[in-house]
Amino acid sequence: MKTRNYLELSQYMIKLLKAAYKKCSKQKVDVKDKGSSDLVTSLDLSLEKFITTALKKDFPETKIVSEEFNSKIEAKGTYFVLDPLDGTINFANGLNSLYGLQIAYIENDVTVASAIYFPSSDSSYTAAKNFGAFENGKKYVVTPKPVSHSLLNINTTRADFDTMYKLLEELKYKFLRFRIIGADCYDFVSASLGNFGGLVMRNGNSWDILPGLFLAEQAECKITTYKDYIIVSNTEEAQSAILKAFRKIIKQQKECKSAK
């Protein structure tokens, strides 16, 4: 299958995500453990199978990196990256608005198109190089807000908890309130809209990060990678405050290690 441009490709991808959910969500869902502090459901698996089958048919020469069946494939060059159900733990625990399907297309190691779909609200978010970010087909850019009126969202794991807790301590009088959502797709979309003044998460698997990060880039968010973390903000003021706090925490951690 050929697409004329990245915008058309992003539209193809969102249609595919919608079709996959419509087909697969009718099945009974089983939940299983997936390593330490993680879950996988039968819906994850059936969605991934549906989407990858379609991609292989329409783009037979393009490799696919995906969470459940193709996670060992090297994320390099030109490829699709897919998270069939991002926010699985939220989904498995009945948090029905806090999960989504996401995909991105990477060309020569550069993300050029992505799509995110939220079934609970039937909401679509797409991004395409040279075209921008779109909510349900309508182009948008991030909405700035004063830091004092903004939410700071962190996406954390057990391994990051101490660092993130210290970050919240540093910023508790800067931002209005804090949130922990636990779904990369939701986090990035909310940050791209300006619903979060700041978002902090560890740079992780390509299927978790690339679709939403590209959306935030195309929505003209402020984005910085610091150490192993990604910081997304709706203003320079918010970005500066988060970076300043992070640098202080990292410096203190280094000093503690040296003292030992």
Regions found by a protein language model. Give the residues of each.
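DPxDG-like acidic metal-binding loop motif
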Residues: 75-134
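Residue-level signal for inorganic ion chemistry
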Residues: 17, 21-24, 44, 55, ...
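N-terminal subdomain of lithium-sensitive/metallo-dependent phosphomonoesterases centered on the IMPase/IPPase/PAP
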Residues: 1-85, 258-260
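A short, compositionally biased
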Residues: 26, 99, 127-131, 217, ...
